[in-house]
Amino acid sequence: MLIIGTYDENGNPNAMNAAWGGQWDNHKIMISMGKHQTSDNLNLKGEFTVAFATVETMVAADYVGIVSQKKDPDKIAKSGLNVIASENVDAPVFTDFPMTMECRIIEKQKESDTGCYIIAEIVNILCDENYLAKDGKPDIEKMNLITFNPIQMGYNLLGKRVGNAFSDGKALK
């Protein structure tokens, strides 16, 4: 589950969860966005953060997806999430999550009355040092990341590595 961090017009931090998003290419991501306070903030600022929810942050991550900042201005305080300002984009970083991407919108696709697809460049990636592998890169197996399960309306723990991308399939050549 992705947590989208933005600032509103008054500089107040906001967060929402997004289930539909992924890699666009090596340096870009795509997120499917409905009409929310977050989409208003994205239109205003054009920059945001994307954090990865974990088992440990699941309750707060779920909360920010079911409560609108428009209706509850104290949403972030009630979530218990800790916030600092990003050094690279005009958006909040929620330090409770193990890894955060700082992003800048480069394109919106298929805009409609109900939402759009956002394509954003990844400006920087922050990772808590407790979640780094020996090579200094993020180790997602250490993070207890969760994903949204739309079939059973729940959250599932992501698993361990099971193969080598662009390699294991060569056995069938």
What annotation goes with each model-predicted range?
Residues 1-173:
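Basic, polyanion-binding surface patches
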